Amino acid sequence: MGKKHKKHKSDKHLYEEYVEKPLKLVLKVGGNEVTELSTGSSGHDSSLFEDKNDHDKHKDRKRKKRKKGEKQIPGEEKGRKRRRVKEDKKKRDRDRVENEAEKDLQCHAPVRLDLPPEKPLTSSLAKQEEVEQTPLQEALNQLMRQLQRKDPSAFFSFPVTDFIAPGYSMIIKHPMDFSTMKEKIKNNDYQSIEELKDNFKLMCTNAMIYNKPETIYYKAAKKLLHSGMKILSQERIQSLKQSIDFMADLQKTRKQKDGTDTSQSGEDGGCWQREREDSGDAEAHAFKSPSKENKKKDKDMLEDKFKSNNLEREQEQLDRIVKESGGKLTRRLVNSQCEFERRKPDGTTTLGLLHPVDPIVGEPGYCPVRLGMTTGRLQSGVNTLQGFKEDKRNKVTPVLYLNYGPYSSYAPHYDSTFANISKDDSDLIYSTYGEDSDLPSDFSIHEFLATCQDYPYVMADSLLDVLTKGGHSRTLQEMEMSLPEDEGHTRTLDTAKEMEITEVEPPGRLDSSTQDRLIALKAVTNFGVPVEVFDSEEAEIFQKKLDETTRLLRELQEAQNERLSTRPPPNMICLLGPSYREMHLAEQVTNNLKELAQQVTPGDIVSTYGVRKAMGISIPSPVMENNFVDLTEDTEEPKKTDVAECGPGGS
C-alpha cells in the first residue's frame, strides 16, 4: 500500500502544474462592456473545463483511498494527513468557485469580436501607386530595370557631387543619373521613350567627357552606352510590345488621351478600376492571339511608319541646318560637268596628292603619320610568317647499325628503336645511296666561311682535298691563274674611264678630220667599248646623279631584305626597326631625288593627266596620249654611241 500511495502522491499536482489558466481582457467603450479578448481559444476552454471535472472525480477517488489507509496509520501521521485533506478541500473549493465564475462570464458576455491585424501603411501606398501608374510609366520602369542590370558596379545610380569628383559641376552643365530618371518617371515627366533615351545618352556622355579614356569609369560608360542603345532600339521595344501586356497598351492609351471627356472623372472609382482591369485583360488577350498573317501585317505597317518618321525627321534637320547657315547652304542641285570621283555619301572628298617637301623636325606643323599609329600594336599572335617545316611523318629513318668491336658476336647488330622502315628497306637505301657524295657541299662550306680568317680556310681546303683526292686544290690553282688576266682587263677599263681628253681649241674651229681622229682615239683607249656622248656638262652630271641614286636604291633594297629576312627573337612583339645604314641610304636617295627634281620642270616629272587624276578632276583631255610620260618604261631610241675599231694595221 505504501508504494501505491507514493505513486498517487507524485500525480497529485500533475495537471495543475502544466495547465495554465487563460488570461482574460474585457474592453469597455463608453461605460458599456463591448468585447472580451482571451489568450486561449474557445475550443481549448471547453476542453479545459471537462478535463478539470474529470480531475475532481479522480481526486475524490484518491481521497476515499486515503481514508481507508488512515485507519492503519499511527497517530502522528494521522494529524499530518488531516492537514493535507483540509488543504486539498480548500483548494478544491477555490477551483470550483473559479469555474463557476468563468461559466457566468461566458454566459453573460456578448459575441466575441475578432479584430483583424493592422495593415501596414507602406504596402497600401505602394499598391495605390501601382494602380495609378500609366502604361508608359510601367514601360519606362521595365526599361530602367533592364538598364540598371547593365551597371553592376552602380557607378551611375546616384548623382555625382563636387566632393566625389572635383570640378564636376564646372565641366558638366547638365548632370544625369538613374535616380533622377526614376524620379522623373515617378512624377510622369516623360512623355515618350525617346526622352528617356536622350537622358540615358546624356548620362553616359557626361561620364565619358569628365573621365579620361584610360579610367574604368570611361570604359564602363562606353560599355553601358553600347548595351543600353541595344535595349532602347526600336526592334527591342517592338518585341517588348508583343510580349508584355502594358507595353501593348501603350499605343492604345496614347490614342485614348485625345478622346477622353472630363465628365468621366465623376464615376465610381471601384467600378472604373474593375472595368479597366477587365478591358485590359481582354485587350491583352486580343493582342496575344492574332494570327500569323495579322502579326506580319502589323509589323510591316509599323516598319513603314518608322521609316516615314525617320525620313521626316531627317528632312526637318536638313531644313533647320539650311536656315541656320544664313544662306551659305542651299538645297538646289548643281548642274556642272566637273565632279569629284572620290566623293563620299556625306559630301566629303580627299585629295590624292603627296606633299612634295616633308617638314623638318622642329618646324610648325611637323607631325609624321605612320600606318602603325592607326592600327596600334599587335595584341596577340606572332610578328613573323609561319615558315615551312617538313612533316616528321615524311622523313624516312632507317635502322641504325651497331659496332661494338671484337668479341661481340652475340650482341645486337642494329637498332630499330627510332626507325620507321624495315631492315630490308634500310638495306636497299644504304646499298643505293650509301656511297654518293654531297655535290654542293664545297660551295656551302665556302659560303659558311666567307667571313672567316685564313686558318679555317686552310682547314676547309684540306678537308675538301681529302674528299676530292686533290681535285679541289687543282681547281683553285686554275682559278688563280685566270684571275690576273681579268684584273688587267678591268684596270685598263678603269683607266679609260678616268682619262679626260682635253680640247686645246674650241670644237667649232676643229675640222672634220681632227674630230674623227679624236673619236677614233677615244674608241682605241676604251678597247671597243661604246662611250656615251652627252650634249652638255649638265647632262653628264645629271646622268651621274641618276646612276648614283640607282646604286643607292639597290643597296637600300639589299639592306631591307637582309633585315626583314632575319628571324627575330620570340620575345619581341614588334618587328625590328630600320638600321642606321638604311636610314642613311634613304636620306641620301631623298636628297638626290630632291636635287634632280629641282633641275627640271614639273611637266618632265608628272603629266597634266596625272595631276588632275590625283586631284579627282575627271575632264577628258584630247592630248592625253601626248602628255602622258611613262617613267617606268625604257626609251625605244638607243643612246647615241660612237664606236670605232682599229684594224691590225692601225688604220
UniProtKB/Swiss-Prot annotation:
Main subcellular location: nucleus
Chain positions with Phosphoserine modification: S279, S289, S380, S482, S621
Function: Acts both as coactivator and as corepressor. May play a role in chromatin remodeling. Activator of the Wnt signaling pathway in a DVL1-dependent manner by negatively regulating the GSK3B phosphotransferase activity. Induces dephosphorylation of GSK3B at 'Tyr-216'. Down-regulates TRIM24-mediated activation of transcriptional activation by AR. Transcriptional corepressor that down-regulates the expression of target genes. Binds to target promoters, leading to increased histone H3 acetylation at 'Lys-9' (H3K9ac). Binds to the ESR1 promoter. Recruits BRCA1 and POU2F1 to the ESR1 promoter.
Annotated coiled-coil segments of the chain: 536-567
Basic and acidic residues compositional bias, start-end: 47-57, 70-106, 273-301
GO BP annotations listed: chromatin remodeling; negative regulation of DNA-templated transcription; negative regulation of G1/S transition of mitotic cell cycle; positive regulation of cell differentiation; positive regulation of double-strand break repair; positive regulation of myoblast differentiation; positive regulation of T cell differentiation; regulation of G0 to G1 transition
Covalent cross-link Glycyl lysine isopeptide (Lys-Gly) (interchain with G-Cter in SUMO2), where: K21, K52, K127, K186, K197, K201, K212, K241, K305, K307, K344, K389
Region annotation Disordered: where it falls in the sequence: 35-132, 253-301
Biased composition (Basic residues): 58-69
Keyword Transcription regulation: yes
Record bears the keyword RNA-binding: no
Location of Phosphothreonine modifications: T514
Assembly and interaction partners: Interacts with TRIM24, PTPN13 and DVL1. Identified in a complex with SMARCA4/BRG1, SMARCC1/BAF155, SMARCE1/BAF57, DPF2/BAF45D and ARID2, subunits of the SWI/SNF-B (PBAF) chromatin remodeling complex. Interacts with IRF2 and HNRPUL1. Interacts (via N-terminus) with TP53. Interacts (via C-terminus) with EP300. Interacts with BRCA1. Interacts (via bromo domain) with histone H3 (via N-terminus) acetylated at 'Lys-14' (H3K14ac). Has low affinity for histone H3 acetylated at 'Lys-9' (H3K9ac).
Motif (Nuclear localization signal): 65-96
Residues bearing PTM N6-acetyllysine: K328
GO molecular function, one term: lysine-acetylated histone binding
Biased composition (Polar residues): 35-45
Subcellular localization: Nucleus; Chromosome
Gene, per the UniProt record: BRD7
Keywords, in A-Z order: Acetylation, Bromodomain, Cell cycle, Chromosome, Coiled coil, Isopeptide bond, Nucleus, Phosphoprotein, Transcription, Transcription regulation, Tumor suppressor, Ubl conjugation, Wnt signaling pathway
Gene3D superfamilies associated with the record: Bromodomain-like (1.20.920.10)
The protein's name in its UniProt record: Bromodomain-containing protein 7
Disulfide bonds: none
Boundaries of every Bromo domain copy: 131-235
InterPro entries, A to Z: Bromodomain, Bromodomain-like_sf, Bromodomain_contain_prot, DUF3512
One GO cellular component, as annotated: chromatin
